[in-house]
Amino acid sequence: MIVKTEEELQALKEIGYICAKVRNTMQAATKPGITTKELDNIAKELFEEYGAISAPIHDENFPGQTCISVNEEVAHGIPSKRVIREGDLVNIDVSALKNGYYADTGISFVVGESDDPMKQKVCDVATMAFENAIAKVKPGTKLSNIGKAVHNTARQNDLKVIKNLTGHGVGLSLHEAPAHVLNYFDPKDKTLLTEGMVLAIEPFISSNASFVTEGKNEWAFETSDKSFVAQIEHTVIVTKDGPILTTKIEEE
């Protein structure tokens, strides 16, 4: 969507705050011994408290309030009886709507200590890639600069990007124009960023694989070689005064 009024801006900030609060609370609770279903129940309670609705359920009929992906799962992991263990690489992806306005956010992190430093490396580089990407976000610049920044960050750290998972427009639905915010440079994409445009920007940084495939069920994505993959995602509003991250809150 394109934000045109103060009311729209405040509505997007409100749902962004809610999604950030849910994401942070779930991350803080992700300790060895908890199940992904128990983590998802935290989201259910908070959505109810704040008067928000899970977007995966509302828009996609997804079997969970949030997507929780562990180790070999890259995205769209279904909350289940799976028990979190020390050293797991976990991704929590939270999207929701309130009063018709949406936000989408995600974070990858290592639970406690891992004996494989690559797990932490993909998380750190995903954060760097996101920061380098939003530095390119201003009205009149090319959308493709985002993907170029993400891909360059990965390459500089001897890592890959996942090419068939992308960011997207967001705001009045979970997925809207632009349909894809790529994590690599596409010279054919001439789309320009405009004032008020709302994007979900989400680098996926991989230890080796460049593509995901369908995993153990109809929802989850995995890599064929069990690469470690990390994602960082925020909902971003393009403005001439710099990007507004609706899903980043002060306590971070």
UniProtKB/Swiss-Prot annotation:
The keyword Protease applies. It holds the Pfam family Peptidase_M24. Gene3D superfamilies: Creatinase/methionine aminopeptidase superfamily (3.90.230.10). One of its GO terms (molecular function) is initiator methionyl aminopeptidase activity. CDD domains: MetAP1. Binds 2 divalent metal cations per subunit. Has a high-affinity and a low affinity metal-binding site. The true nature of the physiological cofactor is under debate. The enzyme is active with cobalt, zinc, manganese or divalent iron ions. Most likely, methionine aminopeptidases function as mononuclear Fe(2+)-metalloproteases under physiological conditions, and the catalytically relevant metal-binding site has been assigned to the histidine-containing high-affinity site. It is an enzyme of class 3 (hydrolase). Its cofactor is Co(2+); Zn(2+); Mn(2+); Fe(2+). A divalent metal cation 2 binds at residues 104, 168, 202, 233. A divalent metal cation 1 binds at residues 93, 104, 233. Its EC number is 3.4.11.18. It comes from the Bacteria. One of its GO terms (biological process) is proteolysis. It catalyses: Release of N-terminal amino acids, preferentially methionine, from peptides and arylamides. Keywords: Aminopeptidase, Hydrolase, Metal-binding, Protease. Substrate binds at residues 76, 175. Monomer. Belongs to the peptidase M24A family. Methionine aminopeptidase type 1 subfamily. Removes the N-terminal methionine from nascent proteins. The N-terminal methionine is often cleaved when the second residue in the primary sequence is small and uncharged (Met-Ala-, Cys, Gly, Pro, Ser, Thr, or Val). Requires deformylation of the N(alpha)-formylated initiator methionine before it can be hydrolyzed. This is Methionine aminopeptidase. It comes from Staphylococcus aureus (strain Mu50 / ATCC 700699). The gene is map.
